[in-house]
């Protein structure tokens, strides 16, 4: 077990902003977090994180995964001060961090989100891992076995898709063609990703994805996404985080307030 205080970090806000599609929610502020071939249980009480790992694993794996090198208090403050209409977003999403995840997994997720929306994309990501990834079990200190799955590599995914007898679905067809291109045609995910992938994986924080935020930006800022992308925030990190502040707000509107103030 490793315990650390992390200000401006909130597990529930990160989960609800759809940044990390395959976290397993046990209850509010308690998650199984999967990364590559590792998984840990993390609980949060206020700013305290109780992590089911040793100190070495925290600094070698999870410190980078959670983007803890970045001062998110400064990121939040810069967004909040830029425009009064950002204040509600900044207050409600102040614990959101960008998460450093697997390249292939994020490429698939970004494409699914672009075509199907975040809710459906998260559901399908779980199904892909369950059907084609390596199955693992761990109690995580709960007393009960919890099953989780590694995200499959392109090699593993293509091998299992080729062994299936049914004709498949459009999603399976996309996955098969993508794996073949990566393995046999020198296909570069870095050069062919959409704006969401560029933000999630490449950390091209000058990008501002339009997935599911067009209507909200038009309504609240009286402009289209292309104009909104030109906002001159102090740092690129702020621009990337702002997208997830907006997405978090849309997906989880407070009961007492249905629009920005």
How would you describe each model-predicted region?
Residues 1-261:
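HhH-family (HhH-GPD) DNA N-glycosylase catalytic core used in base-excision repair
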């Amino acid at each position: 077990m490793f315990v650390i205080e992390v200000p401006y970090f909130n597990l529930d806000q990160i989960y609800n902003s759809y940044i990390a599609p395959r976290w397993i929610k046990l209850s509010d502020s308690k998650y199984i977090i999967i990364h590559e071939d590792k998984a840990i249980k993390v609980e949060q009480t206020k700013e305290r994180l109780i992590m089911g790992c040793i100190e070495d694993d925290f600094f070698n794996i999870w410190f980078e995964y959670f983007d803890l090198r970045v001062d998110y208090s400064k990121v939040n403050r810069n967004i909040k001060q830029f425009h009064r209409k950002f204040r509600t977003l900044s207050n409600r999403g102040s614990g959101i961090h960008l998460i450093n995840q697997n390249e292939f997994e994020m490429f698939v997720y970004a494409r699914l989100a672009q075509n199907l929306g975040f809710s459906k994309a998260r559901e399908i990501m779980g199904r892909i891992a369950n059907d084609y990834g390596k199955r693992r079990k761990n109690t995580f200190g709960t007393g009960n076995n919890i099953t989780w799955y590694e995200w499959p590599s392109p090699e593993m995914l293509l091998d299992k898709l080729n062994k299936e007898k049914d004709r498949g679905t459009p999603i399976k067809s996309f996955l098969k063609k993508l794996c073949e291109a990566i393995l046999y045609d020198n296909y570069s995910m870095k050069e062919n990703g959409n704006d969401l992938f560029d933000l999630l994986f490449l950390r091209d924080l000058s990008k501002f994805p339009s997935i599911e935020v067009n209507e909200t930006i038009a309504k609240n800022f009286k402009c289209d996404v292309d104009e909104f992308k030109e906002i001159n925030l102090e740092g690129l990190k702020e621009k990337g985080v702002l997208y997830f502040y907006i997405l978090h707000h849309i997906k989880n509107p407070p009961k007492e307030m249905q629009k920005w103030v």
